[in-house]
Amino acid sequence: MTAKNAVLQLSIHEERTRKKALVTVSRFSGVTSITMDKSGKMTIVGEVDVPAVVMKLRKLCNTEIVSVDDVKPPVKKPEPEKPAESIAYPVPMNYAYQFNPAYANSYYHQPYGNCRVVDEPNCVIM
């Protein structure tokens, strides 16, 4: 079943009867929206059996079918194609190479105050 737009003319003179008519129509499955004027015109939109709705409403008040139309889906305008956006990906930052901590050179040397010159007795100059 396709969605229909039905306009009904109701002879309603009291607010209480108007509320009962709205509740009666809203109980049908497939009803999308219901609007009602003060003049008594009720507009029903949805996938609903219109003669069944009229039969229920005739138990409350005098009801006439004014028009029944198929609901046309709204025409979508084709959207202009957007140019592909260039996505700027973040540049991965390389961390500087982490060197091991430098250790102090630790070698032992004699202090300069203890140095002495040794004359070798083997050397003979004649």
Swiss-Prot record:
Keywords: Lipoprotein, Metal-binding, Methylation, Prenylation
Propeptide segment residues: 124-126
Coiled coil ranges: none
Upregulating conditions: Up-regulated by cadmium.
Disulfide bonds: none
Residues with a covalently attached lipid (S-farnesyl cysteine): 123
Metal-binding as UniProt keyword: yes
Single GO MF annotation: metal ion binding
Spans traversing the lipid bilayer: none
PANTHER family, A to Z: COPPER TRANSPORT PROTEIN FAMILY-RELATED (PTHR45811:SF80)
Primary role: Probable heavy-metal-binding protein.
Family membership: Belongs to the HIPP family.
Protein name: Heavy metal-associated isoprenylated plant protein 14
Gene: HIPP14
